Amino acid sequence: MSERGFSEVVMVTAVPDQLRAFYEALGWQAEDHEFSPDTLAYWDLPEVTGSECVLQAPDADCRVRLLPVPNTVPLSRPLMTELIVPCGLFDINMRTIDSERTTDFIQEHGWRPLTPPIPWQFGDNAVKEFLAVQADGIVLVIVERVSPPLPGPPMDHMSHVFNSTQLVLDHDESLACLEALGFAKFAEFTGPLPGEGPKVLDLLGRPGDEGDIRLTISQPAGVLDGAIELISTPNIPVTPILENGQGKRGLAALRIPCDDIESRYNKLASGDWSHIINKPLANRSIDGADQLCYAVVTPGGARLDFFAG
């Protein structure tokens, strides 16, 4: 079984040029690929407006795949959706060395900050954090580590996508699903976020214990890079958006490289979680070459793709 987390984010977008320009301005390298009928079926895309674009981060094994569609395609997460409403994949997370500078930069590329950078303390880490959203309803979390410094070489401006969040209704069920897919939980927090932290999800000022969250982080090797974060609000009644989000605009999937993919798939297909399989294991034309891959949709509506790599 692979000990890697996700290495690719898939976005279905009506503004591919805008998103491409954003990542290229950060030094990501773009590569275009023509769609085949096989690819269109795999991504549940009845209509596209151009070729797909795969962007490679300059300093990490991380890619963003842009699938261009007409702006008449509905959003998987409508723009006015309350932040805490479960609806498939919620966000992608990127680090920055300067959140104020980044606020201006992302607005130049079509992102709308939902708050100014919010300073707060989580354990030993002092951070600034804020959310931004763009026209397809994709949510981007910007995190600046104020202290202590992050290990490794300094960033020039912003990092690759280092993790992703899913808001869930049944936390235990979603956690068990990730465990069955090889993602082991390595961190958990329950309660109110300290200081100004609740502002990030618009939970500050909630009465009683409504501002409490449960947060878990899972990744095959127990590291943050490529991890999936689950968040639930156990004391707030929420109605999830349960409509099938496949093929709609927004954050469409996370792609996970894995070793011995056939054994992994057969174990899933013969076990208690076989019902989450969305696309069976097959060789498909991805980026112009055959790739053995399959996809699942988790109980909370998040699509996760596994590919031989």
Predicted features along the sequence, with ranges:
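ER-lumen resident redox/N-glycosylation machinery signature
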Residues: F35, L45, S76-T81, P198-L201, ...
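Amphipathic alpha-helical segments
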Residues: V15-A30, T102-E108, D170-K185, S270
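Vicinal oxygen chelate
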Residues: M1, M11, H33-F35, S51-V54, ...
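Hydrophobic, helix-prone linear segments
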Residues: M1-N71
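Low-complexity, glycine/alanine/valine/leucine- and proline-rich hydrophobic stretches
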Residues: N235, G247-R255
